[in-house]
Amino acid sequence: MARIAGVNIPTNKRVVIALQYIHGIGQKNAAEIIDKVKIPADRRVSQLSDQEVLQIREVIDRDYLVEGDLRREVGINIKRLMDLGCYRGLRHRRGLPVRGQRTHTNARTRKGPAKSIAGKKK
């Protein structure tokens, strides 16, 4: 198994698919990476040379924010919104949907399990 950005990527998959196991790299970024390194799209991870793996590592380290760094950046951005006290920050603080979804019904994923209210009848 090749280890890139602290993640063991599967050896039996194509490189484009295997790179997507790294948090922060999706289809588009994976395709860009193999284009920069000039690896054929149908090549499997097990067929990569050590030099190619090293080149992929260098491209990711140089050009992309991945794994822990990306998670930290997102957390900092959310904390900044909460500290500003803007609408999006308040929604994050209260654990409600941030992007305008309805909350009268639904939004159970964001709000958590339903809380029963004593004495309320249908």
Swiss-Prot record:
PROSITE patterns: RIBOSOMAL_S13_1 (PS00646), RIBOSOMAL_S13_2 (PS50159)
GO cellular-component term (any): small ribosomal subunit
Region (Disordered), start-end ranges: 95-122
Keyword terms of this UniProt record: Ribonucleoprotein, Ribosomal protein, RNA-binding, rRNA-binding, tRNA-binding
GO biological process: translation
Short name of any one Pfam family annotated for the protein: Ribosomal_S13
Entries under SUPFAM superfamilies matching the protein: S13-like H2TH domain
Covalent S-S links between cysteines: none
GO molecular-function terms, A-Z: rRNA binding; structural constituent of ribosome; tRNA binding
InterPro entries, per the entry: Rbsml_uS13_C, Ribosomal_uS13, Ribosomal_uS13-like_H2TH, Ribosomal_uS13_bac-type, Ribosomal_uS13_CS
PANTHER family: 30S RIBOSOMAL PROTEIN S13/40S RIBOSOMAL PROTEIN S18, SMALL RIBOSOMAL SUBUNIT PROTEIN US13M
Annotated function: Located at the top of the head of the 30S subunit, it contacts several helices of the 16S rRNA. In the 70S ribosome it contacts the 23S rRNA (bridge B1a) and protein L5 of the 50S subunit (bridge B1b), connecting the 2 subunits; these bridges are implicated in subunit movement. Contacts the tRNAs in the A and P-sites.
Similarity remark: Belongs to the universal ribosomal protein uS13 family.
Quaternary structure, from the entry: Part of the 30S ribosomal subunit. Forms a loose heterodimer with protein S19. Forms two bridges to the 50S subunit in the 70S ribosome.
Protein name per UniProt: Small ribosomal subunit protein uS13
